[in-house]
Protein backbone atom coordinates (compact mmCIF):
# COMPACT_ATOMS: atom_id res chain seq x y z
CA UNK A 1 0.00 0.00 0.00
CA UNK A 2 2.82 2.38 0.86
CA UNK A 3 4.49 1.59 -2.46
CA UNK A 4 1.30 2.41 -4.34
CA UNK A 5 0.86 5.69 -2.48
CA UNK A 6 4.41 6.76 -3.28
CA UNK A 7 3.92 5.85 -6.90
CA UNK A 8 0.75 7.92 -7.09
CA UNK A 9 2.51 10.86 -5.45
CA UNK A 10 5.29 10.61 -8.00
CA UNK A 11 2.80 10.64 -10.86
CA UNK A 12 1.29 13.84 -9.58
CA UNK A 13 4.66 15.56 -9.29
CA UNK A 14 6.17 14.52 -12.61
CA UNK A 15 5.29 14.53 -16.28
CA UNK A 16 6.77 12.92 -19.38
CA UNK A 17 7.77 14.90 -22.47
CA UNK A 18 8.63 13.72 -25.96
CA UNK A 19 12.06 15.12 -26.81
CA UNK A 20 11.17 15.19 -30.51
CA UNK A 21 7.90 17.11 -30.58
CA UNK A 22 7.26 18.21 -26.97
CA UNK A 23 4.15 16.03 -26.53
CA UNK A 24 3.19 15.81 -22.86
CA UNK A 25 1.96 12.66 -21.11
CA UNK A 26 1.18 11.65 -17.54
CA UNK A 27 2.97 8.33 -18.06
CA UNK A 28 5.93 6.99 -20.02
CA UNK A 29 5.27 5.71 -23.53
CA UNK A 30 7.45 3.67 -25.84
CA UNK A 31 6.16 5.48 -28.92
CA UNK A 32 4.97 9.06 -29.10
CA UNK A 33 1.35 9.22 -30.33
CA UNK A 34 1.98 12.64 -31.89
CA UNK A 35 5.20 12.23 -33.91
CA UNK A 36 5.43 8.38 -33.70
CA UNK A 37 9.09 8.49 -32.59
CA UNK A 38 10.33 5.65 -30.37
CA UNK A 39 11.98 5.94 -26.92
CA UNK A 40 11.89 9.73 -26.84
CA UNK A 41 10.01 10.30 -23.56
CA UNK A 42 11.87 11.79 -20.61
CA UNK A 43 10.54 12.41 -17.12
CA UNK A 44 10.58 15.86 -15.56
CA UNK A 45 9.40 17.02 -12.18
CA UNK A 46 6.78 19.72 -12.04
CA UNK A 47 6.07 22.19 -9.29
CA UNK A 48 2.64 23.48 -8.37
CA UNK A 49 2.38 27.23 -8.57
CA UNK A 50 -0.01 29.52 -6.78
CA UNK A 51 -3.24 30.28 -8.67
CA UNK A 52 -2.87 33.32 -10.89
CA UNK A 53 -4.55 36.48 -9.70
CA UNK A 54 -7.49 37.41 -11.89
CA UNK A 55 -6.93 40.59 -13.85
CA UNK A 56 -9.39 42.93 -15.46
CA UNK A 57 -9.72 42.12 -19.15
CA UNK A 58 -9.57 45.19 -21.36
CA UNK A 59 -11.50 45.56 -24.57
CA UNK A 60 -9.38 45.19 -27.68
CA UNK A 61 -10.18 46.28 -31.21
CA UNK A 62 -10.19 44.06 -34.28
CA UNK A 63 -9.25 45.17 -37.78
CA UNK A 64 -9.78 44.10 -41.35
CA UNK A 65 -7.02 42.84 -43.60
CA UNK A 66 -7.41 45.77 -46.01
CA UNK A 67 -7.06 48.31 -43.20
CA UNK A 68 -3.54 47.15 -42.32
CA UNK A 69 -0.81 49.49 -43.54
CA UNK A 70 2.34 47.70 -44.60
CA UNK A 71 5.70 49.12 -43.59
CA UNK A 72 8.74 48.72 -45.77
CA UNK A 73 10.74 45.85 -44.33
CA UNK A 74 14.15 47.10 -43.26
CA UNK A 75 16.96 44.58 -43.21
CA UNK A 76 20.34 44.92 -41.53
CA UNK A 77 23.21 43.50 -43.53
CA UNK A 78 25.70 41.28 -41.72
CA UNK A 79 28.28 41.97 -44.48
CA UNK A 80 28.69 38.21 -44.77
CA UNK A 81 27.44 37.55 -48.29
CA UNK A 82 26.18 33.98 -47.90
CA UNK A 83 24.61 34.63 -44.50
CA UNK A 84 22.74 37.64 -45.86
CA UNK A 85 21.60 35.53 -48.82
CA UNK A 86 20.05 32.73 -46.73
CA UNK A 87 18.44 35.35 -44.48
CA UNK A 88 16.70 36.87 -47.50
CA UNK A 89 18.94 39.91 -47.80
CA UNK A 90 19.87 40.55 -44.18
CA UNK A 91 18.59 40.54 -40.61
CA UNK A 92 14.95 41.38 -39.98
CA UNK A 93 14.16 43.31 -36.79
CA UNK A 94 12.29 41.22 -34.25
CA UNK A 95 13.20 37.89 -35.83
CA UNK A 96 14.23 34.78 -33.90
CA UNK A 97 16.91 32.73 -35.67
CA UNK A 98 18.10 29.27 -34.62
CA UNK A 99 21.66 28.34 -35.63
CA UNK A 100 22.51 24.63 -35.39
CA UNK A 101 25.42 22.44 -36.40
CA UNK A 102 28.04 19.95 -35.25
CA UNK A 103 30.39 20.93 -32.40
CA UNK A 104 33.41 22.84 -33.69
CA UNK A 105 31.91 23.53 -37.11
CA UNK A 106 32.11 27.29 -36.55
CA UNK A 107 28.71 28.45 -35.29
CA UNK A 108 30.07 30.66 -32.52
CA UNK A 109 32.92 31.97 -34.66
CA UNK A 110 30.57 32.91 -37.50
CA UNK A 111 28.21 34.71 -35.11
CA UNK A 112 31.16 36.52 -33.52
CA UNK A 113 32.22 37.65 -37.01
CA UNK A 114 28.64 38.78 -37.53
CA UNK A 115 28.81 40.71 -34.24
CA UNK A 116 32.01 42.41 -35.39
CA UNK A 117 30.46 43.57 -38.67
CA UNK A 118 27.27 44.77 -37.00
CA UNK A 119 29.11 46.61 -34.24
CA UNK A 120 31.23 48.40 -36.85
CA UNK A 121 27.93 49.69 -38.26
CA UNK A 122 27.23 51.19 -34.81
CA UNK A 123 24.59 48.55 -34.07
CA UNK A 124 24.36 47.70 -30.38
CA UNK A 125 25.02 43.96 -30.04
CA UNK A 126 24.79 41.86 -26.87
CA UNK A 127 26.62 38.52 -26.94
CA UNK A 128 25.42 36.25 -24.11
CA UNK A 129 27.52 33.16 -23.44
CA UNK A 130 26.63 30.31 -21.13
CA UNK A 131 29.61 28.17 -22.13
CA UNK A 132 32.69 30.39 -22.37
CA UNK A 133 34.26 32.95 -20.05
CA UNK A 134 34.86 36.55 -21.10
CA UNK A 135 38.56 35.79 -21.52
CA UNK A 136 37.83 32.85 -23.83
CA UNK A 137 35.53 34.98 -25.97
CA UNK A 138 38.18 37.71 -26.22
CA UNK A 139 40.85 35.22 -27.31
CA UNK A 140 38.57 34.01 -30.09
CA UNK A 141 37.64 37.57 -31.03
CA UNK A 142 41.29 38.62 -31.36
CA UNK A 143 41.72 36.06 -34.14
CA UNK A 144 38.88 37.71 -36.07
CA UNK A 145 40.02 41.32 -35.92
CA UNK A 146 39.22 44.65 -34.35
CA UNK A 147 35.87 45.20 -32.64
CA UNK A 148 34.09 48.45 -31.86
CA UNK A 149 32.67 49.42 -28.47
CA UNK A 150 29.15 48.66 -29.72
CA UNK A 151 29.62 44.98 -28.84
CA UNK A 152 28.77 44.05 -25.25
CA UNK A 153 29.48 40.70 -23.59
CA UNK A 154 27.66 38.89 -20.80
CA UNK A 155 28.40 35.51 -19.24
CA UNK A 156 25.13 34.37 -17.70
CA UNK A 157 22.71 31.44 -17.85
CA UNK A 158 19.88 32.71 -15.62
CA UNK A 159 17.17 33.84 -18.03
CA UNK A 160 15.51 36.05 -15.43
CA UNK A 161 18.74 38.05 -15.00
CA UNK A 162 19.31 38.12 -18.77
CA UNK A 163 15.82 39.52 -19.34
CA UNK A 164 16.56 42.35 -16.90
CA UNK A 165 19.85 43.18 -18.63
CA UNK A 166 18.15 43.26 -22.04
CA UNK A 167 15.44 45.62 -20.78
CA UNK A 168 18.12 47.92 -19.33
CA UNK A 169 20.62 47.88 -22.20
CA UNK A 170 18.11 47.70 -25.10
CA UNK A 171 20.42 46.09 -27.69
CA UNK A 172 19.45 45.78 -31.36
CA UNK A 173 20.86 42.27 -31.82
CA UNK A 174 21.31 39.48 -29.26
CA UNK A 175 23.34 36.27 -29.52
CA UNK A 176 22.44 33.40 -27.14
CA UNK A 177 25.21 30.79 -26.97
CA UNK A 178 23.67 28.36 -26.31
CA UNK A 179 19.97 27.73 -25.63
CA UNK A 180 20.76 24.42 -23.87
CA UNK A 181 22.66 26.26 -21.11
CA UNK A 182 19.89 28.74 -20.30
CA UNK A 183 17.45 28.20 -17.45
CA UNK A 184 14.45 29.98 -15.97
CA UNK A 185 13.70 30.20 -12.26
CA UNK A 186 10.06 29.56 -13.14
CA UNK A 187 10.88 25.98 -14.17
CA UNK A 188 12.34 23.46 -11.72
CA UNK A 189 13.98 21.10 -14.23
CA UNK A 190 17.65 21.21 -15.23
CA UNK A 191 19.07 23.39 -18.05
CA UNK A 192 18.75 21.68 -21.41
CA UNK A 193 15.58 19.81 -20.45
CA UNK A 194 12.47 19.96 -22.61
CA UNK A 195 10.71 22.30 -20.18
CA UNK A 196 13.67 24.67 -19.84
CA UNK A 197 14.35 24.86 -23.59
CA UNK A 198 10.69 25.54 -24.28
CA UNK A 199 10.46 28.18 -21.54
CA UNK A 200 13.70 29.88 -22.63
CA UNK A 201 12.69 29.95 -26.29
CA UNK A 202 9.26 31.31 -25.41
CA UNK A 203 10.79 34.10 -23.33
CA UNK A 204 13.27 35.00 -26.08
CA UNK A 205 10.46 35.03 -28.63
CA UNK A 206 8.52 37.52 -26.49
CA UNK A 207 11.64 39.68 -26.22
CA UNK A 208 12.26 39.56 -29.98
CA UNK A 209 8.69 40.42 -30.95
CA UNK A 210 7.89 42.79 -28.10
CA UNK A 211 11.08 44.85 -28.26
CA UNK A 212 11.84 44.34 -31.99
CA UNK A 213 15.23 42.84 -31.20
CA UNK A 214 16.83 40.29 -33.50
CA UNK A 215 17.81 37.19 -31.50
CA UNK A 216 20.22 34.50 -32.71
CA UNK A 217 20.04 31.23 -30.76
CA UNK A 218 22.86 28.68 -30.94
CA UNK A 219 21.58 25.10 -30.64
CA UNK A 220 23.58 21.93 -30.06
CA UNK A 221 22.97 18.85 -32.20
CA UNK A 222 22.58 15.17 -31.32
CA UNK A 223 24.77 12.31 -32.56
CA UNK A 224 22.23 11.83 -35.35
CA UNK A 225 22.86 15.40 -36.52
CA UNK A 226 19.52 16.80 -35.37
CA UNK A 227 19.13 19.93 -33.24
CA UNK A 228 19.04 18.77 -29.61
CA UNK A 229 15.86 19.35 -27.64
CA UNK A 230 12.19 19.31 -28.52
CA UNK A 231 11.03 19.87 -32.09
CA UNK A 232 8.90 22.70 -30.71
CA UNK A 233 12.15 24.70 -30.56
CA UNK A 234 12.41 24.67 -34.35
CA UNK A 235 8.71 25.46 -34.68
CA UNK A 236 8.87 28.53 -32.42
CA UNK A 237 11.66 30.34 -34.26
CA UNK A 238 11.31 32.28 -37.52
CA UNK A 239 14.38 30.84 -39.25
CA UNK A 240 16.48 27.69 -38.82
CA UNK A 241 20.07 27.78 -40.10
CA UNK A 242 21.92 24.48 -40.07
CA UNK A 243 25.66 24.20 -40.70
CA UNK A 244 27.00 21.05 -42.29
CA UNK A 245 30.56 20.02 -43.02
CA UNK A 246 32.59 17.02 -44.08
CA UNK A 247 32.97 14.99 -40.89
CA UNK A 248 35.68 12.86 -42.49
CA UNK A 249 37.82 15.80 -43.57
CA UNK A 250 41.24 16.03 -41.96
Label every PLM stretch briefly.
Residues 8-20:
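Short, charged low-complexity linear segments at domain edges
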Residues 94, 102-105, 113-114, 118-203:
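Conserved inter-motif catalytic segment of the P-loop NTP-binding fold
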Residues 205-250:
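Phosphate-binding/switch region of NTP-binding enzymes
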